[in-house]
């Protein structure tokens, strides 16, 4: 993951096209070091463009020391983030992924001169297949253009509400975005808001490779018998994706480590298809566990957990 603050650079407006910015070797002499994960304002404060907002009265809206998104417009806090990275030789003949865990609020994802993805919403991760554009064993470039929320809102109280109500969220317009509502002002942060509304790459970005089938988003639902809690019925679900251009037949296997419980299913996937596969205790009786080791709160017992291993093979 690109975590260290100087592994990415940041810049606002530039006349260079995205195709050029996202090429390896692009000159970033006028760019600033970026804080990733972090926000645009986080990086600007780090580079002494603006003072620390938590110091004194620096963040007060009426002092206008740090410009507010609602006054400046979205372009003011629209920034490019850029870095270069190597793709290992052992990624050859595999599917190469760029996983972006969280960007606020909209973003264009460019790799080696190509627009490979768009994101919107603060909390939705994106899995971008860069196999056809990655340069194995060579230098690669990643450039991300990040846009603020569509509706920044203001600290002006909304027109409706109960008498004496604390006006968290200002005029409420920030709620039209899928984002962090407290960015416009809340009683346990700044009453008058975060100036850039937390625009930026706020979670990790990862590069990795997989085989021709991929599993994601495993989920386990436990149903305990009552009143004795001496039986646990486990339902396991997982998403399986075929990122290739051909149909595949694959096998998903599961194992509850240390319990001698295994289960598996075969399935066919068309090219680019994603399916959710489900293992139920009705279909797999071994998923009914007798006398399960339960998780107990502190001072009530041991916080027991089971370990589940899921694999997919072709």
Question: What is each stretch, according to the model?
Answer:
Residues 3-7, 11-314:
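Secreted/periplasmic carbohydrate-active enzymes, especially glycoside hydrolases
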């Amino acid at each position: 993951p690109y975590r260290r603050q100087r592994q990415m650079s940041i810049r606002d407006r530039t006349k260079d096209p995205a195709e050029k910015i996202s090429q390896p070797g692009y000159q970033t002499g006028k760019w600033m070091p970026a804080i990733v994960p972090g926000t645009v304002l986080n990086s600007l404060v780090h580079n002494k463009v603006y003072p620390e907002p938590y110091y004194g009265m620096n963040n007060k809206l009426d002092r206008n020391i740090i410009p507010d998104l609602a006054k400046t417009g979205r372009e003011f806090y629209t920034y490019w983030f850029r870095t270069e990275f190597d793709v290992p030789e052992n990624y050859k003949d595999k599917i190469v992924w760029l996983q972006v865990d969280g960007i606020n609020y909209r973003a264009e994802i460019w790799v080696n001169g190509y627009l490979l993805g768009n994101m919107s919403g603060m909390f939705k991760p994106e899995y971008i297949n860069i196999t056809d554009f990655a340069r194995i064993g060579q230098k690669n470039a990643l450039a991300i253009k990040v846009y603020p929320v569509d509706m920044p809102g203001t600290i002006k109280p909304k027109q409706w509400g109960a008498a004496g109500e604390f006006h968290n969220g200002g005029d409420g317009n920030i709620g039209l975005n899928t984002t962090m509502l407290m960015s416009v002002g809340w009683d346990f942060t700044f009453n008058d808001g975060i100036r850039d509304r937390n625009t930026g790459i706020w979670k990790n970005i990862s590069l990795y490779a997989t085989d021709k089938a991929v599993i994601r988003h495993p989920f386990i639902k436990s149903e305990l018998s009552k009143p004795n809690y001496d039986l646990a019925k486990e339902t396991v679900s997982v998403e399986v994706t075929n990122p290739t251009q051909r149909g595949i037949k694959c096998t998903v296997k599961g194992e509850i480590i240390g319990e001698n419980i295994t289960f598996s299913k075969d399935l066919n996937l068309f090219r680019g298809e994603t399916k959710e596969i489900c293992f139920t205790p009705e279909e797999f009786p071994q998923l009914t566990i007798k006398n399960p080791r339960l998780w107990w709160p502190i001072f009530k017992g041991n916080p027991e957990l089971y370990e589940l291993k899921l694999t997919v093979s072709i």
